[in-house]
Amino acid sequence: PFYLVCGYGVTGRLLVHQLAKRDIRAVVVDIRQDRIDALELDNLPLPVPALCADASLPDMLDHAGLQHPKCIGVLALTNEDRVNLAIAIASQLLLPERQVISRTNSDLTTANLASFGTDMIVDPFRAYADYLALAARSPHKHLVYDWLINPRHRHLASAYKHAEGRWIICG
């Protein structure tokens, strides 16, 4: 079985590396040849087939293995909402039982992805904002959360302490 990973930027690369470390196969589609070249130089423990193509085109997804019986899921991780939406729609229309996970940067795209039955929708900016808000509002809950998801655990004494006065968060 394998996952079809569309987009080999920072997120796609980290995900493919983690999948390979766990002996889970992946096929990568990215529109940029330099990213495909980087994948070939990454020295992964498993071979990872890659295709330099526009993942928003259903024919390219099909060529990469979307309808292959061993494809167990599609991960739309490009930097463009338009492309991720096209990947999710094509995946859901061609094989509705196939798991689809998509990255998004806007509420409008989130709503569109949800309307097509996307299994999981991740907005990295909203997720990070929620993470920061938890740290500010509930430092000990944040610490427990960090223990659960972070491989480099912090000590209990390292919970964030509230600084007096007003905060300015930029970004």
What kind of feature is each model-predicted range?
Residues P1-G171:
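Cytosolic regulatory regions of ion transport systems
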